[in-house]
Amino acid sequence: MFDFVMSEEEIRIRDEVRSFVRNEVSSEYLQMLDRDEVDFPIEVYRKLAEKNLLGVRFPKEYGGRGSTWVAECAAVEEIGVLGSAIGCVYAMPSIVGEAIYMFGTEEQKKKYLVPMLKGKLVSAEALTEPRGGGGSDFFGTTTTARKEGEYYIL
């Protein structure tokens, strides 16, 4: 991302993430990921959380830094150097967190968003289900929910 469009704070966050990429994730670890010797890079996820680098655009009251989308995008760009596995893990609290932040109750934000940004809760999303020609038509996705006891089966 170009420095001339970024504020000092956004540059500082980008540089923090860049430093994390260079100093906290070894090439040996990345090779282990490539060889499928790591099921989920939880160690990296927790280190990012310890450094308050997850969901930097969310308000501080929920564990973010109260920064901007520009800072978030710059951080994602830097993390992307580590490959898609870690990039997806990094982006998930932001993607899932956005739905909780925008549409969740205060109770849900405290129950899910805060622990996500602290690295104590791992989030995920499902884009498609088997149907027709498959693919990843995010806006065309349909879902059914069936109640079984106290739970819903999606």
At which residue positions do the language-model features occur?
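Intrinsic disorder at enzyme termini
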Residues: 1-14
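An alpha-helix initiation/capping motif
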Residues: 11, 15, 35-42, 65, ...
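N-terminal glycine-rich anion-binding loops that anchor highly charged ligand groups
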Residues: 16-24, 43-51
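C-terminal helix-coil-helix/basic helical segment that borders enzyme active sites and/or dimer interfaces
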Residues: 26-36
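Short coil/turn segments at secondary-structure boundaries
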Residues: 33-34, 60, 126-129
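Internal helix-loop-helix
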Residues: 50-122
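Glycine-rich, Trp-frequent "lid" loop and neighboring beta-strands that shape
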Residues: 64-65, 107-154
